[in-house]
């Protein structure tokens, strides 16, 4: 009889080999799962980048509210165009929000950028502009943004949105306790909840700011989402 078997080293070696092979197999499975998840996130990000650019309006929502006797959502138009600047990254956009009945009344100007963050989630970062008038109506002349640099931006720190696939679209939300946007009644809110939804021809946005007592300072208490429908695609 083989003495190595009598003294157990043979069986110990086999057991050790099995453990090593098992660990290697588990590592391969984890790596494969991670790779699949990363690939899925890349495909989701690419899909969002195709859907997002364009011109949107929520006039239909406004009219439906009026017809139903509800407090109407303000009628707004939103234009979103890509920013062609290597400094801004491959997934950067200019967003301008205007009154639907008067495009000269501009309410919001932002630069939004997208990336797959360290956690593997799709992250949207939001920034306002140091000189809003310089970039006003930039959606009409997108070449203007080739001159944009990071110093032109004021990041909304803590207000990143994290996106995930949901049904036939995507949903995004921030971490409210980290986001402290200024409101009309106070310099900074204790928490701000940002929510967004994106489908191939639809975009929904809401912003609700609360004070330290939980009282709503800005935004709608009921039906907070402004629901926009795409009126035209952005032409590359």
Which residues does each PLM region occupy?
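C-terminal motif of bacterial Sec signal peptides marking the signal peptidase cleavage site
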Residues: 30-31
């Amino acid at each position: 009889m083989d003495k190595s078997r009598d003294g157990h080293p043979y069986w110990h070696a086999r057991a050790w080999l099995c453990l090593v092979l098992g660990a290697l197999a588990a590592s391969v499975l984890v790596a494969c799962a991670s790779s699949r998840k990363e690939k899925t996130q890349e495909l989701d990000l690419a899909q969002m980048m195709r859907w997002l650019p364009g011109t949107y309006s929520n006039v239909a929502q406004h009219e439906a509210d009026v017809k139903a006797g509800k407090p109407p959502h303000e009628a707004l138009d939103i234009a979103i165009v890509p920013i062609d600047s290597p400094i801004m990254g491959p997934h950067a956009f200019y967003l301008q929000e205007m009154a639907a009945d008067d495009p000269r009344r501009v309410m919001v100007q932002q630069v939004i950028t997208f990336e797959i963050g360290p956690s593997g989630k799709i992250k949207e970062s939001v920034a306002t502009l140091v000189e809003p008038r310089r970039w006003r109506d930039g959606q009409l002349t997108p070449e203007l943004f080739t001159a944009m640099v990071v110093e032109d931006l004021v990041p909304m720190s803590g207000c990143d949105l994290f996106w995930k696939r949901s049904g036939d679209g995507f949903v995004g939300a921030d971490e409210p306790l980290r986001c402290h946007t200024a409101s009309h009644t106070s310099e900074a809110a204790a928490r701000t909840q940002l929510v967004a939804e994106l489908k191939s021809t639809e975009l929904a946005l809401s912003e609700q700011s609360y004070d330290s007592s939980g009282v709503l300072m800005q935004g709608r208490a009921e039906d907070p989402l402004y629901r926009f429908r795409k009126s035209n695609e952005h032409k590359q």
